[in-house]
């Protein structure tokens, strides 16, 4: 009895404890309570140090638990959740990565789910442990359990790298036919991820994408839109046939035909609508026929998107964007304009911002919209929200012209002084510098504006702004007197700034000052060089000046030393800095000391800017040709450009192989550099093309935008015969009465006898200054700049072309004549013909040409205006509008007959002679072999056979063989040759096989070279198309070629290029020429040519690096041998 009681009393505490912990669930409680306790403990801490101590203790405990061999999968799952929480806090839990993969491999559904979740959070695409997950994913993709398949598809679309795609791609393709819509949708999203990282590997399943677009489930269809939006952005023309499908889908969405679960606050599938609108905007761009298919659905979208929720505002914004992107329709434009007006006039800040953003976009096509909302835009300039003010400045930037540049730049500077955010300062400083260089009214305003830019922008602004400003001062403009006045005012302004006491200037501004004072102080009459050196010496002695800036200052002092005539400050400067701890400054001091001791050497080296001639750098390093030739003869490897080496490196990289017998798969091709978009120089002679291609900017893009508005109003509307819009009154001058400022309001006020207040008058005066030049007589172009602008700072032409003396009373222009010659007489010529002079006479030197069918006809070259050149534009080469007196070039048309080479014997024997010649057709190279019998005997079964050649496609033409070649008769064999992939040269080889009467057959072998030049053809495009191609190409090559005869005319240079390289002259503007060609079948290349005093600067851009390198090399040979 006593034993029984004792046992009962002993067991009671355990029973009470079990009930307290929750009975049977008590075994799970410690793990969940630990996670909850960890979260509560972290949130209760008051310092980062305490948090780190707690997490490290937890990680140590977890490491011991997961490493223990007795740990169950259930315990591992709960530990993995705590590891995820630790990683989310930023602490390293890498010891658990391998256990997460094991958990995904071995657990049940819940444990596998936690394992996959941990893997997707722990690992990235390039992590080496991902290789261990491939077999698990493949096994789960083949599983019959839907949850396992979904988990595998999810992790594939999240973290799978491009090297592992071939292992799972066939399985994911099969899932596109799965009966469950969730599997099909996740498979489409996985393929979308593959398309983003390796588009070449999914090219063969584009037809399955179309099936997904027509899937019966809305979720699968919506997932496929992600892929199509991406593909249409890259190549809209290839998917025009799907326009009706997208329109039909949008009609069903707008009409509410989708299930209710796709609606958001009673708005049917808003994000699906937005994607479809973006797709339609890309498909209908510059395509009237395609745009007509979507007019009705866009009208319906505008009508049904009632302003009752924020998401409908996004739909309306996309509708407006699409309407102004496609081929325009007047009714839709009017409705879109009303929608923009509702946004702009809305009291809600978000809607006002959306309206300004839409107005900023559409202002490029319809500048009259800005005239309708002038007062609202003026009010937005003083809006308390900084984002509204910044977007308003962006809008004003788009409509800047020579008449309103002063007021707009002033507003930008006011905002710049108030802003503290670095990225805003960088963006605004670049735009102000661009506008100042393009539309500066005078020298004083330009220098003062740039001083403000350097002062406010400081050391955070783009370094190219500094170098471009100095280059502009150094190169000058067309007027030498104006150049000197600009430089003199710059020197005077900088001396005035340096004389101000207790004023701090940014380091880059001081660098600009030092360079200008060192170069152009000789222009001063009242200030001596010693006084300038004194000011520079004070800066050198300041402790707040950086070592880099001191180097600039030292260089300026060195330039001024020959003019200072043994200034004691120079000797004092040498003594102080020859013992400096800074290596660079000490080197400068010793150089100055050496020059100071040798007066003759100093005078010969430091002649001053007034005695210096223009220096043209030889970027091609032609003076090293002998050294290169010697190295190549001794077996040295030829130089390969960086992009070519990178392509070879990518092609040789090993990839993971998931098949036992080496299943091949196409790897993603090398993607070239992005098109240049940096704040950069125009037509640089010795610039680095690699650096140019890597810069970035916020400059405006004009690529692909069609001009819909001109001086006569809305161009497509007038062409269609509809009525014209009423013209807004043009504001003649600043301060005049504005007749088009909120006209409806003004008329209403006048009817009611309203007298404008002082504040309203000030707004109207400001509007007259900001929106001057936006009337129909002076509209803005696609970039928001005036159509006709008197460019203040135009680069100086280094070479003056001789003017004709035949008509001294009329303005003359240089005549140019170019010819594209053939290798033999009879080739057609493509050259510059006579130009139309002011007196109506034609005068030029025409090149003689012999044609196979007669002289070619001449055709006037269409002159297409481009924006004015800018040092700060997003493109390194821009062509400015020529003056009205400039010459208009004409180009000869191709002759009807194809050009061909001469007949050349390539092999022969005692019985047969084989000759060949090339015919350069527009679509291919035609090689014709002529087989001629030398004897009286007849021979039979004559056949010509060509061996296959890598990179070339050879097609036998009709009548290519002859059963019998009669005595003394010649028979021709024709083969068309096409280059499939660009290469420098190929060798075409084969044999002619024939049999004489009553004798054995004879085989005669031959070979011939096929250089790349055989596949280059002139490309006939407009100047506008030239600009678009220039912006779209990634591979560019620059080189400067010295010419033997200084002062050569541009026409002579273009003639040589046309005759020898089959280029076509697109336009000639001043001392610059635009040329274009294409590598068959369709690889274009554009060339910008500029003639200097004793050199020619050439700049090639093409989608093929081989083509641009080849043309660059051969241009140098042509120019040096001419």
Swiss-Prot record:
Sequence segments annotated as region (Interaction with TEPSIN): 726-1122
Pfam families, per the entry: Adaptin_N, AP4E_app_platf
Signal peptide: none
Domain of life: Eukaryota
Annotated Basic and acidic residues bias: 714-728, 745-760
Residues covered by region (Disordered): 714-760, 797-861
Compositionally biased region (Low complexity): 841-853
InterPro entries registered for this protein in UniProt: Adaptor_Complx_Large_Subunit, AP4_complex_esu, AP4E1_C, ARM-like, ARM-type_fold, Clathrin/coatomer_adapt-like_N
Subcellular location field: Golgi apparatus, trans-Golgi network membrane
Residues with Phosphoserine modification: 699, 851
Gene3D superfamilies the record matches: Leucine-rich Repeat Variant
Keyword Mitochondrion applies: no
Membrane topology qualifier: Peripheral membrane protein
Recorded GO CC terms: AP-4 adaptor complex; trans-Golgi network
Keywords (A to Z) from UniProt: Golgi apparatus, Membrane, Phosphoprotein, Protein transport, Transport
Biological process terms in GO annotation: intracellular protein transport; vesicle-mediated transport
Broad class of where this protein is predominantly found: Golgi
Keyword Protein transport listed: yes
Matching PANTHER family: ADAPTIN, ALPHA/GAMMA/EPSILON
Subunit composition and interactions: Adaptor protein complex 4 (AP-4) is a heterotetramer composed of two large adaptins (epsilon-type subunit AP4E1 and beta-type subunit AP4B1), a medium adaptin (mu-type subunit AP4M1) and a small adaptin (sigma-type AP4S1). Interacts with TEPSIN. Interacts with GRIA2; probably indirect it mediates the somatodendritic localization of GRIA2 in neurons.
Function as written in the Swiss-Prot or TrEMBL entry: Component of the adaptor protein complex 4 (AP-4). Adaptor protein complexes are vesicle coat components involved both in vesicle formation and cargo selection. They control the vesicular transport of proteins in different trafficking pathways. AP-4 forms a non clathrin-associated coat on vesicles departing the trans-Golgi network (TGN) and may be involved in the targeting of proteins from the trans-Golgi network (TGN) to the endosomal-lysosomal system.
Name the record gives this protein: AP-4 complex subunit epsilon-1
